[in-house]
């Protein structure tokens, strides 16, 4: 699952405290849907996803993005038990929504990109390494029901 050092935990928690969950969530999910258009099929109920500007301005995309990052914020409090933290969400996405688990990795990578954009020089290679470890572990936890 990925072992987090105390330094990783401090790095992740410190940056997370500065993240605007609403803005970063909407941008992360929006970018996922624009950059990887095949992921849109899981969001047919979201209305207009016909263009990048439609997606980035879509209130349902923003709301769900906020929900996703709020869930991630809960996980940050439980880095040593991500599998347990995401057990129900893994079940939902696997059994009911049939989301390809690869999409969790894509979303994590997009989040890292968004954080890099938002935090610029503060998002050092060391910070990126800790966050990449975390989003990889979260993707693995969300995929656990699939195995």
From Swiss-Prot:
Residues 3-147 form the Globin domain. One of its GO terms (biological process) is hydrogen peroxide catabolic process. InterPro entries: Globin, Globin-like_sf, Globin/Proto, Hemoglobin_b, Hemoglobin_oxygen_transport. One of its GO terms (cellular component) is hemoglobin complex. The modification S-nitrosocysteine is found at residue 94. The keyword Signal does not apply. The modification N-acetylglycine is found at residue 2. Pfam families: Globin. GO terms for molecular function: heme binding; hemoglobin alpha binding; metal ion binding; oxygen binding; oxygen carrier activity. The modification Phosphothreonine is found at residue 13. Heme b binds at residues 64, 93. Keywords: Acetylation, Heme, Iron, Metal-binding, Oxygen transport, Phosphoprotein, S-nitrosylation, Transport. Red blood cells. The modification N6-acetyllysine is found at residues 60, 83. The modification Phosphoserine is found at residues 45, 51, 53, 140. The keyword Transport applies. Gamma chains make up the fetal hemoglobin F, in combination with alpha chains. Belongs to the globin family. Heterotetramer of two alpha chains and two gamma chains in fetal hemoglobin (Hb F). The ratio of gamma-G to gamma-A chains in is approximately 2:1 in infant chimpanzee, and 1:2 in the adult. This is Hemoglobin subunit gamma-1. It comes from Pan troglodytes (Chimpanzee). The gene is HBG1.
